[in-house]
A protein has these predicted regions:
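Short, small-residue-biased leader/transition segments that mark boundaries at the very start
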Residues: 1-2
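Post-Walker A helix-loop "phosphate-sensing" segment adjacent to the P-loop in P-loop NTPases
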Residues: 11-24, 34
Length: 160
């Protein structure tokens, strides 16, 4: 969630400063790419995902790509290289990208070479905010249940 929130904040700031922005969930975006797959890349330059100053791709690596999808992804990255900015949110480390990109280390290397040239990589580590909220909610429910049964809070904590 933090990744997406940060990406949206950066995209919003870009819009406020007059830049064009396109935001896609990668799985949904792949559907569009497959439809455009037979079109020559130069004819795609007016597509939103090619022409935007900033392209935000959310949830990269949630599902592995087929060879066709990985090649289409390369085509977009290659076309946009040094023409527009791209933000990619992912929970995958760079070392696991070949596995996401149809197991093709050469293709992954070519994509990463273009993406990482002049890039800023934010590696955010820590516990999931969703899980943190769930744990807090479960702890509150447990305390409420103990209270309704008349168990003092100190005794409840001691049993944990």
């Amino acid at each position: 969630m933090l990744f997406r929130s940060l990406a949206i904040a950066l995209a919003t700031r870009a819009l406020e400063n007059g830049f064009s922005v396109s935001y896609y969930n990668v799985d949904e975006w792949m559907h569009q790419l497959k439809q455009d797959g037979a079109v020559h890349p130069m004819q795609l330059k007016h597509r939103k995902y090619m022409a935007s100053n900033l392209l935000v791709l959310d949830e990269f690596g949630y599902q592995s790509m087929s060879r066709e999808e990985a090649n289409l992804f390369f085509r977009v990255v290659s076309y946009r290289y040094q023409k527009g900015s791209t933000i990619i949110t992912t929970n995958k480390g760079i070392g696991s990208w070949p596995g996401v990109l149809a197991g093709d280390e050469v293709l992954a290397g070519a994509i990463l070479d273009r993406l990482l040239h002049s890039a800023t990589v934010l590696n955010i580590q820590g516990r999931s905010y969703r899980l943190k909220d769930l744990e807090s909610s479960l702890a509150n429910q447990s305390q409420a249940a103990d209270k309704s049964r008349g168990i003092p809070l100190e005794e409840s904590r001691a049993s944990c």
